[in-house]
Amino acid sequence: MKHRIVTAAQMKEIERAGDAHGLPYLQMMENAGIAAYAELQKQFSHPGRLLVVCGKGNNGGDGFVIARTAAKDDWNVTVLLAEGEPKTSDAILNFERLHSLPVPICTDCSVLETQHFDAAVDALYGTGFHGEPVSYTHLRAH
């Protein structure tokens, strides 16, 4: 698959055009999460322990899709809500879909001190990020 780099504004326009032509934002989120999980699978020969660090926006929603897909594929998944519960409707829906699976949802970073993970997914910020970068030194690697 050939990839091209686009700006945040171009990505927003691509998504808007997709939605206008019958590809809903929720389906785009599903597709993005499944594609990201497929990349993760290429790095591991068998399921392990996965940490998915999610933000409160649509990038976090992508993370919830990754977590759900991995859990259904026998990964031991933990989700860390780094900024609290999701705020966008599509992210909320994908967050709620996790509740039927054995996926612990944490808001306390102490999970990083008490558990070992084979892989971690950063689903904090995407193209909608604005403002000053936030320091997540409490999410440091161990």
Give the residues covered by each predicted segment:
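Positively charged, low-complexity intrinsically disordered leader regions
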Residues: M1-H46
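Structural motif
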Residues: R49-L51, A119
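Glycine-rich, N-terminal phosphate-binding loop of Rossmann-like dinucleotide-binding domains
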Residues: C54, L124-Y125
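Active-site-proximal loop->helix
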Residues: G61-I105
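Glycine/threonine-rich flexible loop motifs
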Residues: Y125-Y136
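Conserved small/polar residues in nucleotide/adenosyl-binding loops
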Residues: T137-H142
